[in-house]
Regions:
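ATP-binding pocket architecture of kinase catalytic cores
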Residues: 1-36
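Helix N-cap / loop-to-helix initiation motif
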Residues: 166-170
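Active-site acidic catalytic loop and adjacent metal/ATP-binding pocket
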Residues: 88-136
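Active-site activation/catalytic loop segments of kinase-like enzymes and analogous catalytic loops
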Residues: 133-165, 178-192
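Conserved protein-kinase N-lobe ATP-binding Lys motif
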Residues: 5, 126, 144
Length: 192
């Protein structure tokens, strides 16, 4: 199953942040949390599971196949474990934040958002149910990894907030998600 995106969303008349915020507003109207594709409120557990499995696999690979590449990965491992644990801890502390708003309810989101709404077709396999900040963080992460342009990131955030302002809780989740090195895990998942 696919979703066809309206033509107006691909034109440059509306900013990317506004389009994503409108998408999240529509997605938040979905009244049921689809358990199979939901990550809402589960980032901490997912991140812990991913870190544990990743650490176990790298240790196993380095023991079974000792080579310079695996040695380099093992040398970097404490760094990635450390920043992963920092992100997990910050996320868990953020759950105690009481300054949240209607924008913090679950919505339809993307697995890894990168201007997906500019495409003519969105595949259902790319969608999930989560906190809208997931898409904002992944958009920012890609922009930072491609060619850091803080002005375009700030414009995106301003566009988004002109439609759907973020709460303090949302900002904390955004920071936690950006802190977690998911791009590192994605890279190694593709390599193996």
């Amino acid at each position: 199953m696919v979703i066809k995106i309206n033509q107006f969303q691909r034109e440059n008349t509306v900013g990317s942040g506004q389009v994503l915020a409108q998408f999240h507003q529509i997605g938040a109207q979905y009244s049921f949390e689809p358990q199979v594709i939901s990550s809402y409120g589960k980032w901490g557990n997912h991140w812990i599971d991913k870190l544990t499995a990743f650490e176990r696999k790298l240790l196993n690979d380095s023991q079974e196949h000792p080579n310079p590449y695996n040695q380099l990965i093992m040398d970097c491992l404490p760094y990635f474990i450390g920043i992963s644990e920092n992100a997990i801890q910050y996320f868990q502390e953020s759950l105690y934040e009481k300054r949240y708003d209607f924008v913090d309810q679950g919505s339809i989101t993307f697995h890894r958002y990168h201007d997906n709404l500019k495409q003519q077709v969105v595949w259902l396999s790319d969608l999930m149910y989560d906190h809208p900040v997931r898409d904002i963080a992944e958009y920012i992460r890609v922009k930072l990894l491609e060619a850091p342009n803080l002005d375009s990131i700030l414009l995106f955030l301003q566009d988004y907030e002109s439609v759907r302002p973020l709460s303090v809780f949302s900002w904390r989740l955004l920071y936690a998600r950006l802190l977690y090195p998911i791009h590192f895990y994605d890279f190694f998942a593709k390599k193996n």
